[in-house]
Amino acid sequence: MLSLTNIHKKYGSHEVLNFMEWKIDRGIYWLKGGNGSGKSTLFRIISGQIPFKGEVQLDGINLRKEPINFRSKISFAEAEPQYPLFIKGKELFDFYVDTRKAERKQAEALADYFEMTPFMHNTIGSYSSGMLKKLSLICAFIGDSDLYILDEPLITIDSASAEKLYILIKEKASEGKSFLLSSHQEVSSDKLSVDQVFQIIDKQIIPIHAAVTD
């Protein structure tokens, strides 16, 4: 499903990632690693947001050769989302609905689900960190992607919102969608079944263990 080959990424003289191959099938995957280990860099590479050396393919679609088609299959929620502070939540919401040709009812249902509907007409600059995170998750789930990349999805949100996120991930996974998650916190095994855990160690992606089940 997802294949990365001959990946090399550095910032200036600082090498962050350097590995030959990493492949995963459909499923839910958790990526561990400390600050600066390369988790966010890896996610930005896969989502086509930064330049890199190597090849990335999703279901046979090559990021370099078919960038628009490739990106249309991926949703990415950053660890620390940064949006223009002067726009309203609804304006960002509408942008994602339009660009992803999504059903407005689906997007509105997501806003209700994460209890953000009353705040959608407020400017993003007035949002708390938790509200901002929930907005980014709503935007990530708008539309119908094949791969959802959620970088630190549990930070700044309360336990009730985390529970809702777990449920949504499981619902999407049951529809054949895949997830790449990263978290400094332990993913609760009684909340979410994870097919494989990986860790970035010395610029390499190393499998830790598999089948963290309910």
Residue locations for each model-derived region?
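Walker B catalytic motif
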Residues: E152-P153
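Hydrophobic anchor residue at the start of the ABC signature
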Residues: L137
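A short, proline-enriched helix->beta-strand linker immediately N-terminal to the Walker B motif
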Residues: I142-D146
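Helix-to-loop junction immediately C-terminal to a conserved catalytic motif
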Residues: I46-S47
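Q-loop/switch helix immediately C-terminal to the Walker
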Residues: E80, L85-K101
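Conserved ABC ATPase "signature" region
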Residues: R104-M120, F141
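Conserved structural motif at the start of ABC-family nucleotide-binding domains
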Residues: L2, V16-F19
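Conserved ABC transporter NBD signature motif
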Residues: P51-F70
